[in-house]
Amino acid sequence: MENGQGTGSKLGLPPLTPEQQEALQKAKKYAMEQSIKSVLVKQTIAHQQQQLTNLQMAAVTMGFGDPLSSLQSVAAQRQRALAIMCRVYVGSIYYELGEDTIRQAFAPFGPIKSIDMSWDSVTMKHKGFAFVEYEVPEAAQLALEQMNSVMLGGRNIKVGRPGSIGQAQPIIEQLAEEARAYNRIYVASIHPDLSDDDIKSVFEAFGKIKSCMLAREPTTGKHKGFGFIEYEKPQSSLDAVSSMNLFDLGGQYLRVGKAVTPPMPLLTPTTPGGLPPAAAVAAAAATAKITAQEAVAGTVLSSLASPAHILSQQMGLPQAVLAAQAPGIITGLSTTKTVFHLVGLVNPVLASPPVTAPASMGTPTSAVQLHTEVKREEDSRRTAEDHSAPVGNGQDSELERLSVSASAGRQAAIQSKSTVMVLRNMVGPEDIDDDLEGEVMEECGKYGAVNRVIIYQERQGEEDDAEIIVKIFVEFSDAGEMNKAIQALNNRWFAGRKVVAELYDQDRFNSSDLTA
């Protein structure tokens, strides 16, 4: 059985060729790795459920409120902080430079998800600044460190954090503190032809490596040009960053920096008594091995009558080899790398292998169920918050009208779901410049996450000398944050003007009707 011929001789099948035996071994290795990943996910879910049970018991014992809402709130805050950490503000951009130039300049630090450049509808030119969003926070951190004051198009560009980072600063600091417990570094601008082993062999010069993993596309299996390396000693990671940043490897200059987030940033720190990572991986490997041994007999017998088995006989390849070479599957992975760090903004509870593991070890449905329940609870909580949030300054009079008029009640319900604030009488046409939008976003970012800012000039007549009124629309990600901004900014004085901050109808805003 060890040489891959025992089963064939018993069933009257021809012996495997050396190439087929090699492919079969690769398939077995890959199946074992996927099984270990699946078991690790199950362990994570079980550990989280145990933490939740402990929180609930503590809440009942001590008379606290619902712990589930608190746990969800922490997860949502960490998710929002990670999203903010992935964005950088780029200012002082020369007006002739376009999005392609910005992308080319900032792409070496990591994959870019989006570039948001604000355009002037009159001049059809951008307003001199942009927001670049990366897939991982480490890419944004490197861009922030290495691109500020760099000459681009004859100007020294300004690179900084978005204005909305202020509110998330405590959580960002907490993530950074958790990241310091791991000796991880981030490596970007990796040549497409280099493999995990190539990178590991280069960086091993600075110390013993615990794990080296490049982020890969789930469909093609090709790496995305970045990855994470974890050393055993802190000094090794420091030496690697100082020596390998801007190192020419394969014709591309590497970008190397310290990791600013833990391996699984959406998880709160493990409580004392939890299983250490190494022990968890070892336990997962043992569990996967036992499960695989139990499934061997049933899998072999059932495969004899399957269509895949018939196809394998026609092609001269065993079924296991066909499975190993199916589209979207990565073969030839090393089983010695049993530490699986998830990179980017991926919920570790939902992180599943790129392909389905063997039938007896499929993707755990409990993870999907848990996510669905948590999502439903979060939506219910947000809906309740939205309906209870104050609506502008005339809340008392609005409540009176609600009791009298059903139509007014429906209107109030629609408005309570709006996340758009309009600022009136804040500036005049002569005060509009390239920095105004960024300044408004930074100021409003103190009250919550700002999706976008629109500066609208409304002419009050068809005459050439008709008065122009400037309205500034600010869209938040949450209605509660928008209401905080209204309460803080309404009737506030700015440059000799008394600002009026009001809620704006969401449907009008979505349909680009800014005239109300």
UniProtKB/Swiss-Prot annotation:
Q: What are its GO cellular component terms?
A: nucleus; ribonucleoprotein complex
Classification from the root reads: Eukaryota, Metazoa, Chordata, Craniata, Vertebrata
**Keyword set, alphabetical order:** Apoptosis, DNA-binding, mRNA processing, mRNA splicing, Nucleus, Repeat, Repressor, Ribonucleoprotein, RNA-binding, Transcription, Transcription regulation
The record's section on SUPFAM superfamilies has: RNA-binding domain, RBD
Q: What domain notes does the record hold?
A: The third RNA recognition motif, called PUMP domain, is atypical and may rather mediate homodimerization and/or protein-protein interactions.
Subcellular location, in the record's words? Nucleus
Deletion consequences: Morpholino-mediated knockdown of the gene results in embryos with reduced body length, microcephaly, retrognathia and heart edema.
List every stretch annotated Disordered.
Answer: 356-398
Domain (RRM) spans 86-164, 183-261, 419-506
Q: Which organism is it from?
A: Danio rerio (Zebrafish)
Provide any one GO MF term from the record: RNA binding
Q: Which GO terms describe its biological process?
A: alternative mRNA splicing, via spliceosome; apoptotic process; mRNA splice site recognition; regulation of alternative mRNA splicing, via spliceosome
Which coarse location class applies to the principal site listed for this UniProt protein? nucleus
Q: Which superkingdom does the taxonomy of this entry point to?
A: Eukaryota
Q: What does this protein do?
A: DNA- and RNA-binding protein, involved in transcription repression and pre-mRNA splicing.
Quote the SMART domains the UniProt record gives.
RRM, RRM_1
Output this protein's name: Poly(U)-binding-splicing factor PUF60-B
Q: Where is the composition biased (Basic and acidic residues)?
A: 372-388
The text of the family note is:
Belongs to the RRM half pint family.
Under InterPro entries, the record lists: Nucleotide-bd_a/b_plait_sf, PUF60-like, PUF60_regulator, PUF60_RRM1, PUF60_RRM2, PUF60_RRM3, RBD_domain_sf, RRM_dom
